[in-house]
Structures are given as structure tokens and as C-alpha cells.
């Protein structure tokens, strides 16, 4: 049995495509699209980038965010999740202590080395605006696709 994921889109899957368009210093801006339709802008830290490739996305309960999050690594080390639980966090904009790439809302990547792919609308170099209003519909689309038994695949270019 072949466990590799095909680079060809599959009809029973939700295919997200992350195209990195601008890389300067520690900022990597890009666009997230579904079936050729641009959905939102992305922002990543170049020191913690997920390598180009194809990743299955799964929803895993994240103790840091206290909710299910779309994670690029289905074999996420959940035994490390207690390390991610920050006592009395002042903000959810903290970095995670281990490399756990996921799609999440956020407006800046300064100091983030956890592989996060932040979604929002491009504002200026290194900044996104309206991250929550962009993330919520994207999350619902991913959640509904998974609940219908479809695969969700992220292709990073």
C-alpha cells in the first residue's frame, strides 16, 4: 500500500494551496487558495517555515488555544502538548515551545519559530489585519470537509 499523497488534486478532498510570494528577512508573505480561488493572505517566519510539499491537515485539540486547530502534522507529538499550556497567558499571540505547524489567526510573526501559518488580510510587510474574520470561515470549511469524510490537503509551494 502506498502511503504517499499524490500531488494531483483529488475530487473527494479539499485542496488548499499556499503560494509564497514575497520573502524578505524573517517575513514570508503568501496567498492561500482553494481550487484556484484566492481565499486570504498568509504570513510566516522564515526561520520556522514548513518546507515546500504536500501536507494532510487534521483537526487536533490544542491545549494552548483550548480548541481544535488545523495542524499540518497528523502525527503531532501530543505528549508535548502539556508544554504548550501556558499558565495565565496574557495573549494567545505567544509562540508555542515546540515546532507544531498549524493554520491560525494572528497579525505578526515576530519571534515565532513554531511553524505557524498565520492567515488574514495583507496590511504591510510583516503584518496582517482581520485575522479572526478570515480564520473562522476557513476553519469551518476545513471542519465541515473533514466531518463529511473528505481529506484536507495543503500544498505548499
Describe every region a protein language model picked out.
Residues 2-152:
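Cell wall/extracellular polymer interaction/catalysis modules
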